[in-house]
């Protein structure tokens, strides 16, 4: 969970991970302002259509795009958004859910 003022950190983390040895594609995402998922994808693999992947990840409730090797996506959490009453325990469980869901979505779309 990060504030909208710190959302640039998502891209910074994705850029940093791409610089690691043997990493050709990196993905970083976060719950931003408690009401949306924002993600950043970086890839040195020209065969991976990052802008298309980001657009698909944004889906009908968000958006996404990019250019060769770089992209971002977002979508609203709707009724699952943090209304300010989530305690740390619930936030931890919610993050576990979001993390697992995003990883499954990414793997499914990349294997297409």
Spans of model-derived segments:
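Gly/His-enriched, cation/cofactor- and phosphate-binding structural elements
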Residues: 1-112
């Amino acid at each position: 969970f990060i504030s909208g003022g710190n959302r640039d950190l998502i891209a910074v983390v994705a850029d940093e991970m791409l610089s690691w040895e043997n990493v050709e594609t990196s993905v970083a995402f976060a719950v931003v302002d408690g009401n949306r998922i924002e993600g950043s994808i970086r890839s040195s693999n020209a065969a991976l259509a990052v802008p298309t992947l980001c657009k698909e990840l944004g889906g009908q409730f968000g958006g996404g795009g990019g250019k060769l090797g770089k992209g971002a996506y977002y979508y609203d959490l709707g009724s699952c958004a943090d209304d300010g009453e989530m305690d740390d325990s619930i936030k931890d469980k919610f993050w576990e859910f979001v993390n697992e869901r995003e990883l499954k979505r990414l793997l499914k779309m990349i294997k297409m």
